[in-house]
């Protein structure tokens, strides 16, 4: 098989998963570089980069790169492609060529996003792309249009991927295997795919109307022609809120596997409760979107509804957190690096969830909206939730993907550095938010200097951790320590074919013996 046939025209779920992991790693480093520019600007009062336009272009690009080109490709494209077929005993994904197209839509999409920064003044709209700031007066030129096309491609990629995963998971299990016997990671990807399938078309509609408002003189979001900019916010957040659950749900699946494995348990505590909790989170995620819009002047009864509905999500989330703790209980805990990431995830994700409950209160949110309290909240659940889950999964399944083991001491040291860095970066931002420092500004009054400086020092520590990770991966491929014998394969069937598994697995249907 030629290099081009294998890597450009691939129809193999393992190879496509590897492509996604490499692309996501690369994009993650670009997104980290953007975040370091943000923290360099905010490290002390005064100006570093120029005006607020270039600052907001960097903020916007940081968000898009991290969400659409790092977290989603790694979690859904990388881990999803690699593990879902292995975990359900399928020979590949349901639509292998569409799988390849889903991946190859991402590099052009990334290219369009980068292009949007290089023409005119760039898209300094924030990742929400609200009009009228994103309209053709405040953002004349092609920047926002290129960003919109970038989102279109990334969206098509995710929709096709979602169709592929839903079909694969429902249709390609052995007949004897019921949906309630599939591993939790498979469930998490299935629910994530359903969320993508239902939410992305609404985003596509919203940004397409914005595109025609900008270029064809329609007035969907322009009051002068009977439109309403608030409509855009509803359309965007109807996608945007499910999106944040799309980013964390596969992480829930990963953490369930890692915690059970390193606690020496044959399954996570409360399997059915975990499944129903994820289903509930997926459903509730669609009916809370306007909690992002408490400041736009909705009726008090509307705000009361969105406050209560948002708080209800804490219940299934709590079920998951306590089930993970119950899985740990009585286990023989192996303090391997994946377990450290998983425990860090549980602790920090819970803190992020608690600040989320604070923000759910519509009255409190009036004061906290668009302050650094919100930034701190969602970076606790993303930078320490989603990213810690990715690193737990990566350190756990790296031997499966490559056949080589990571250096245990250096991987633990990497966890320590990263844990310190992200907490020093984002914990002080709660104080800044409570003190009223607004988001998306490149400068601030002197009173905010201390916490901003500490936050920026934290970002440099996190950067050190990223460099350590790259070195750790290089070291593993360089030293070529082989995997001797994976453990607990009876309840972790992705490992049964060896490390790494052969190019084709389950070529003949798997034999499934159902427990009585």
From Swiss-Prot:
Topological relation to the membrane, as annotated: Multi-pass membrane protein
Transmembrane portions of the chain: 13-41, 52-87, 96-118, 142-171, 184-213, 229-262, 271-287, 300-328, 337-358, 372-401, 408-434, 448-479
Protein residues bound to Mg(2+): 369-370
Binding site for Cu cation: 241, 291-292
Keywords for this protein: Calcium, Copper, Electron transport, Heme, Iron, Magnesium, Membrane, Metal-binding, Mitochondrion, Mitochondrion inner membrane, Respiratory chain, Sodium, Translocase, Transmembrane, Transmembrane helix, Transport
Residues noted as binding Fe(II)-heme a in the record, renumbered to the chain: 62, 379
Location, primary (coarse class): mitochondrion
Protein localization: Mitochondrion inner membrane
Binding-site list for heme a3: 377
Involved pathway(s): Energy metabolism; oxidative phosphorylation
Residues that, per the record, bind O2: 245
Described purpose of this protein according to its UniProt entry: Component of the cytochrome c oxidase, the last enzyme in the mitochondrial electron transport chain which drives oxidative phosphorylation. The respiratory chain contains 3 multisubunit complexes succinate dehydrogenase (complex II, CII), ubiquinol-cytochrome c oxidoreductase (cytochrome b-c1 complex, complex III, CIII) and cytochrome c oxidase (complex IV, CIV), that cooperate to transfer electrons derived from NADH and succinate to molecular oxygen, creating an electrochemical gradient over the inner membrane that drives transmembrane transport and the ATP synthase.
Protein name from the UniProt record: Cytochrome c oxidase subunit 1
Organism, scientific name: Coturnix japonica
Lineage, top ranks: Eukaryota, Metazoa, Chordata, Craniata, Vertebrata
